[in-house]
C-alpha cells in the first residue's frame, strides 16, 4: 500500500509575509504587540473579577 504525505501550511491570510525587516514589518510587529498586550490586559481583568469561577470551569474541563 502506498502512503501519501501531505504538507500543510499554517494559516492566516497575511501571515505569509516574508520580508518583515522594513518599516512595514516594524509597524506590523508593533501592532501585534499592542493587540497582544490588550488581550492579556483583558484576561487579567477577567481573572481579577472572576478568578474562582475561571478556575472552577478550567478544572471541570480537565485542566490541572
Curated annotation (Swiss-Prot):
Q: Where is this region: Disordered?
A: 1-36
Note one Pfam family from the annotation.
Pup
InterPro entries tied to this protein: Ubiquitin-like_Pup
| Coiled-coil regions listed in the entry | 24-52
Q: Where is the composition biased (Basic and acidic residues)?
A: 1-11
Which pathway does UniProt place it in? Protein degradation; proteasomal Pup-dependent pathway
- So what does this one do? Protein modifier that is covalently attached to lysine residues of substrate proteins, thereby targeting them for proteasomal degradation. The tagging system is termed pupylation.
Q: What is known of its domains?
A: The N-terminal unstructured half of Pup provides a signal required to initiate unfolding and degradation by the proteasome but is not needed for pupylation, while the C-terminal helical half of Pup interacts with ARC to target proteins to the proteasome.
Checking NCBIfam families in the record gives: pupylate_cterm
Name of protein: Prokaryotic ubiquitin-like protein Pup
Q: Which gene encodes it?
A: pup
Amino acid at each position: 500500500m502506498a502512503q501519501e504525505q501531505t504538507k500543510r501550511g499554517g494559516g492566516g491570510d497575511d501571515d505569509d509575509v516574508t520580508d518583515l525587516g522594513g518599516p512595514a514589518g516594524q509597524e506590523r510587529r508593533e501592532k501585534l504587540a499592542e493587540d497582544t498586550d490588550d488581550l492579556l490586559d483583558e484576561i487579567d481583568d477577567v481573572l481579577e473579577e472572576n478568578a474562582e469561577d475561571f478556575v472552577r470551569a478550567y478544572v471541570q474541563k480537565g485542566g490541572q
